Structure formats: structure tokens, C-alpha cells
Amino acid sequence: MTTETLLIELGTEELPPKSLKTLATAFYDNIKGQLDSHNLSYSDIKWFATPRRFAVQVFDLVEKQDDKIVEKRGPAVNVAFDDAGNASKAAQGWARSNGIEVDQAERLVTGKGEWLLHRATVSGKAVVELIPDMVTTALNKLPIAKPMRWGAERTQFIRPVQTLTMLFGSDIIAGEALGVSSSNQVQGHRFHHEGLVTINHANDYQAELAKAYVEVDFNERQNKIVAQIKQVANDIDAVALIDEELLNEVTALVEWPVTLVGTFDEDFLNVPAEPLIYSMKDHQKYFPVTDKNGQLVNKFIFVTNIESKDPNTIIFGNEKVIRPRLADAEFFFKTDKKQSLESRLKSLESVLFQKQLGTLKAKSERIASLSQFIAEQLNENAQDAYRAGLLSKTDLMSDMVLEFPQVQGTMGKYYALHDGENENIAQALEDQYRPRFAGDSLPEANIGCAVAISDKIDSLVGIFGINQAPKGDKDPFALRRAAIGSIRIIIEKQLDLDLSTLINKSIELFGDKLVNENTATDVLEFIMGRFRAFYQEQGISVDVIQAVLAKKPSAPLDFEKRIKAVTFFGELPEAATLAAANKRVGNILAKFDGELYQSFNTDLATEQAERDLADIYRDISLKVAPLMADKNYQAALSELAQLKAPIDTFFDGVMVMSDDEAVKINRLTLLNQIRNSFFAIADISVLQ
């Protein structure tokens, strides 16, 4: 069958840069889904996106659907004909609806009877007939939160639509979408190529747009931007800070990237680097630059959408724009330092953390007390921990943080050092928000860990305590992130802390503000649920996680040891048999409603296999006890794995549910003791 390249492009006014890639890939997914659902084969499909368009190119697309045979079953033969063999009205009506005579029908014989049958060949539709509706469907399914109208039209889309291009090879596919008819013309560069560009063949799309100063491939354009930035940075013997989110946004802002470098006054470097960096990135979409040692320098790299004959004019304009931004940061820094962090404590009384839970001042005091409590458990400086907790939210009242919320905590560190606070306290102020996201760094020192954990536990306990736990996708206080962050800090920093203890201490600090009587249980259950996500991201199997969750160990380090032990156990050759045996024992005991003995009675053992199992188990138990005391779960499971052979022999030769009640209970007691030894570590019966 003949194949051709399909091109579909929607040309628009400037699309929101933060949404461009999402829109383009969603359109790609939708078109691909439409092609697949219509049984149209192709070799490859590619997506494109610039500020004023998104498109797909489909290669080696068949020109039409395959023909297919459709079987249409009619009435049963005994209904289709009377005794004389004449066709009934039912048979005639069915035949007429299928465009045949009754005697042209085939017969379908099954085990349930015989029916009339018509096999019809349905011709496949041409691609050019299908594409317009497919495009409309793909556009309607795009994730657009706030569509807009333009002109006198009632059509709605994310931005006004200028062109629609639908080409199959060199043929224009007739149709329209969003009020625009299809053509073979697309928009060139807004400044370098003001007219429309004619695409004579779908294969020419990328090359023709390149002539019109449009690099239409998003990924290729991004690669060019990265290469240009690195080259410019290398030319000034510096290193550019290339943030992925900013890079995506800049790529979505330009069609023909040209990268330049600007300079700002060195005096601005007296301001901490972080607010300067955020000002350059967030406000101006510039890439900050450091020296080879990572120190910010008075340069910035920016990407323009114009290949200018006089780039110095563009550079001067951008230098002029960045100057007042950096001057604002400098002013905030100088002004903020006139007031100590401690003096800002009172102003926290005017800011609510949450209506039922009180102000940020009250939260700071709770964080301080819980931080002190944690520091005492870790044998750290409790006084420093309390001080850091108390000052933890004060920088939120500074002008710098009000202007650049991203530097909260970081500015607290700088202001604390300026106030004469010690290094531990200052660093803890910055560390309190860590980890901010998956893969983020953790607090540097244990004082910072104490404050970070306290802040997170306080939020968890408070919000659960007023019955406002996260529901569905709604998590306004970022409690899921708080739970995972607490887990990460405790495990990765190897802190000997118990979540139940911390939760109960936090509840105590809230006084009578909490109304949920089950706060402690609810918070612990919520955090336990985050363990699943935490370990799944590390590639731990779900059944291993489930096995440990059955024990609900509230100390994360203990949880971690059990996970490692069960993972190790699951790889042993004895694991499958012992898991099955534990499950079998659990099922047997679940059906037994009597009372077991305190211990196995050898006098009631009538079979050699049960005596052998009891003896071996006793010897192994003596080895396991000190291992459990040391929480050496892996070694304990290694010892218990030796029970496989005697357990196999026991089940092969011993009737557990003996007619003799005493013997039966004795055997169940032995099996229960063995099961409990495993369950002291994890529920291995769930392993698969």
C-alpha cells in the first residue's frame, strides 16, 4: 500500500511558555492515539513546538485503512424459514437491511444451532477523510485550564489561532479546526520572515521553516541553546548555571536562539548570591554565571529571539533592565539587616499558620520545643536547637523573603550570622526546609535535622489534629512531602528517632488545640503509607514493603533494617517454601478458635518429625534471641531459614489437625511459635 508523510501544524499567537511542551506532547499523544485507534500504520511520529505553533509529522503513513470483513448474523434457520422452506419476514427484513437476497446468505453452524450469516467487505477509509475529525478530537482533548475567545468568534482555545496546516505528502487535506481552514502555509519568524511560508511537501517542513529563521524542533532548539550558553560561558572563562525548568521556558520563548552575555555592577555581589540568582532566573529569564570555584560573577547569559546586526544594543538594553532588579535586592538586604531576627519574633504574632492552630509565632515556639527534645535524644546541643527553632520563621517577615519567597531559610542563615548567632543555628535556619523536593539535599548537621523534622511533624500533627488530612490530590500544607522528608532525613542521616515518640511529643505541645482523638494513630498511619512510596522509588518490591508494614515499626531506622533483611531473605532458596509455610500456618490458626499452650510439650509429641522440628527450632531460637536484641534482623532470618527442611518433613509426615485434641493443640502451639519468630521481623507469608 502507498505511504506518505503526514504534517499537521496549528499556528497561533504566542503560547504560554510554561505550557508549550506539555501542549505539544499532549497533541502528539492524542494524534498517535487517534492513528492507532483507526488502525492506520506508520513507521514513526515526531512532535514540534515553538512559541507560535505545535505540530506533528507522521512518517510512512498508509493512505487508507485496510479493508475488513464484517460478519453479520441473521435469524436462526428455524425462524428464517417456514416448514415449506419459504423465507420468513424476519429473514427477508434482515437480508434487505444487508443488501442481499435471502438465498445469498451463508449458514453459521455452532453447537447451539444454525443461523443465517452475511460476510460483508467494508472498504477502509482514506486517511484524508479521517484526519480532520482526528485533529479536532486531538485538540479538544488538550489540557487547557483557561481557554480564551478572540474577535467576534465563539471559538475557544489557549491562544488565538492563525493557521492550520494538514498535508498528506504534497496534498492539502481539506478541513478546518478552531474556525481556521487548512492550507499549506505556516508562520515564519515574527521579525526575520514576516510573510507566510509555503510548505509544498510534508517532508519539507523542518527545512523550509529553518530558511524562515524558525528552528521548529523543540529538542534540537534546546540543544542549540545549551551549546551556545556553554560556548559563551567558556569564552569568558566561567560556568553557566543551567536550570532545567528555566531552560525549558527559554526554549519555549524563542524560535531562532541567539545567546549573548551581559554585565552588571560588581558592587551587587555584596548581596548574597541566592536572591541575585533568583532575580536573574525568575524575573528576567537569564542564566547566572559563576567562576570555576562556583562563586557568582557579575555576568549573565541570556537568549534572544533576534539575530541582530547590532548585538551590543540588545546587550545594553538587558543590562539596563537587570540593574533595578538587582538594586532592589541590594536595598532589601541592607534594610533587613537593620532589624535582628529576634526582634521580628513579635511580628510573627500577626501571621496565621492556620486559623485553628494559631500564629507563626506559636508554631515557632512548638518547633523550638520539639527541636530541643530531638536534640536531647541525639545528644546534640539542645540550647542551639531550641534557638534555631524559635528563629526558624522570622526571616519570613523580611523584605527580601517577601520579594523572593524561594530564599526563605537561606536569608535566615545570612541574617542570623549578621546578628551574631553561631554557625550551627544559622545553618539550621537554612536547612529547615530540606528536602524541598525529591532528590534534594538534606540538612548538613543534626541541629538542622532536628529543626527540619520538628517543622514537618508539627504540620502533620496540627493538620491531622483538626481533621484536615489530605484528600485525593488536595494537599495544601504539603503533608505528603513533609512525611517523606522526615523519613529521608531520619534514615539517610542515620538518626535514632522514633516517630511515635515525636508525634506524641508534638501533640502535647499543641495543648487543647487538637480535636481529633486519633491524631497519633492517623499521623503514624499516614507516614507509614509514605514508606511504601519511599521504598518503591528505590526498587524494593511491594511484597517486601508489605511484609515490613505488617509490623508497623515506628522507628525509621528499624524499618530500614527490616526492609534490608527481608530483601536479603527473599533471595534465599528457602524463602518461597518458608513464605508458603507461614501462610499455611496462618490459615490453619485462623480457623482454630481454641487456646494454645504456653509452650510446646514434648511429652505430647507422638511423631519423630515434630520432635525433630521442636528440637531444631529450640536450638535456632537460642541463636536468634541475641540477634533480635541487637536488631540484626538479617542474621536472624538467616538462622530461621534453616527451618525449611524440618518444616517440610513435618508437613509431609504429620497430621496437624489430629483427632487427639491435646496433640493437635500442641502441634499448633509449635507452629505458632515458629510463625511468631518470623513475624517478630516481618510477615514473610506475603512474599511472592
Curated annotation (Swiss-Prot):
Question: Which Gene Ontology CC terms are recorded?
Answer: cytosol
Q: Which PROSITE patterns match?
A: AA_TRNA_LIGASE_II_GLYAB (PS50861)
Keywords, comma-separated and alphabetical: Aminoacyl-tRNA synthetase, ATP-binding, Cytoplasm, Ligase, Nucleotide-binding, Protein biosynthesis
Q: What's the name of the protein?
A: Glycine--tRNA ligase beta subunit
Q: What class of enzyme is it?
A: ligase
Q: Taxonomically, which superkingdom?
A: Bacteria
Instruction: Please give the family membership noted in the entry.
Output: Belongs to the class-II aminoacyl-tRNA synthetase family.
| GO terms of molecular function | arginine-tRNA ligase activity; ATP binding; glycine-tRNA ligase activity
Q: How would you summarize the oligomeric state and partners of this protein?
A: Tetramer of two alpha and two beta subunits.
Gene Ontology BP annotations: arginyl-tRNA aminoacylation; glycyl-tRNA aminoacylation
Q: Which SUPFAM superfamilies match?
A: HD-domain/PDEase-like (SSF109604)
- Organism equals Colwellia psychrerythraea (strain 34H / ATCC BAA-681)
Family matches, as Pfam families = DALR_1, tRNA_synt_2f
EC assignment: 6.1.1.14
Q: What is its main location?
A: cytoplasm
Where is this protein localized, as stated in its record? Cytoplasm
According to UniProt, the reaction catalysed is: tRNA(Gly) + glycine + ATP = glycyl-tRNA(Gly) + AMP + diphosphate
